[in-house]
Swiss-Prot record:
Record-stated family: Belongs to the universal ribosomal protein uL1 family.
Keywords for this protein: Repressor, Ribonucleoprotein, Ribosomal protein, RNA-binding, rRNA-binding, Translation regulation, tRNA-binding
Pfam families noted in UniProt: Ribosomal_L1
Protein name in the entry: Large ribosomal subunit protein uL1
Protein's organism: Nanoarchaeum equitans (strain Kin4-M)
InterPro entries for the chain: Ribosomal_uL1 (IPR002143), Ribosomal_uL1-like (IPR023674), Ribosomal_uL1/biogenesis (IPR028364), Ribosomal_uL1_3-a/b-sand (IPR016095), Ribosomal_uL1_arc (IPR023669)
Function: Binds directly to 23S rRNA. Probably involved in E site tRNA release. Protein L1 is also a translational repressor protein, it controls the translation of its operon by binding to its mRNA.
Molecular function GO terms recorded: rRNA binding; structural constituent of ribosome; tRNA binding
PANTHER family (alphabetical): 54S RIBOSOMAL PROTEIN L1, MITOCHONDRIAL (PTHR36427), LARGE RIBOSOMAL SUBUNIT PROTEIN UL1M (PTHR36427:SF3)
UniProt key word tRNA-binding: yes
SUBUNIT field: Part of the 50S ribosomal subunit.
Length: 213
């Protein structure tokens, strides 16, 4: 669906002093977002091209283990002590959030939970973000790798939205494969499939938009 030539064309913009992200821009049509909400998680087969920040909420018995795999680890007591400014900052900074199942009620009632909810980042079982109390290294290593390659799609109000699919450091073939995976998954989630898509563009953060669908 997305060709290597289209990826090359999207690279033609001026070089920047930072590593740009490849993004697909979707424009939907004939979808009433008041009745239908597009919410899904997509694992990119060729990865994101960079490490994504992940926040974990676990019991004190699992904190040391979790710190090996996640960027910030909070316990029940840490949740209680968060002020509004810190909670808001944590919710904004982290792309994924995981939490032990037995701590979900407390997370939901906390300041952090409120800001995560606003951003659509509350731990979701569909993405494997709800943890059992008996954690182990093999489990967390696999989860870290999976989440690092997982993008979140949460469309509530606007028929135009973007999905990150990699960085400019990645090979053209990898970007094309990731793009196909995301487009096919979005189509499968829409009420009328491809008929609900008006257009799809591929672009770098500061680059030209190339129509791919």
């Amino acid at each position: 669906m997305v060709s290597v030539d289209q990826v090359k064309k999207a690279r033609e913009g001026k070089k920047r002093r930072f590593t740009q992200t490849f993004e697909l821009i979707f424009n939907l049509k004939n979808v009433d977002l008041r009745k239908y909400r597009l919410s899904t998680y997509i694992v990119l087969p060729r990865g994101r091209g960079k490490k994504m920040p992940i926040l974990a909420i676990v019991g004190p018995e699992n904190k040391e283990l979790a710190e090996k795999y996640f960027d910030i680890v909070l316990t029940r007591e840490d949740l209680k002590q968060l002020d509004k400014r810190t909670a808001k900052k944590l919710a904004k900074r982290h792309y994924h959030v995981v939490a032990q199942a037995d701590l979900m009620p407390e997370l939901g009632k906390s300041l952090l939970g409120r800001f995560l909810g606003i951003r659509g980042k509350m731990p979701n079982p569909k993405a494997g973000q709800i943890l059992p109390p008996n954690l182990n290294e093999k489990m967390l290593e696999a989860l870290r790798e999976k989440l690092n390659n997982t993008v979140r799609v949460n469309v509530k109000k606007h028929v135009t939205f973007g999905v990150p699919i990699g960085t400019e450091d990645m090979e053209d073939e990898a970007i094309a494969e990731n793009a196909d995976t995301v487009i096919n998954e979005i189509i499968s989630q829409l009420p009328q499939g491809k008929q609900n898509i008006d257009s799809v563009y591929l672009k770098l953060t500061m680059g030209p938009a190339v129509r791919v669908l």
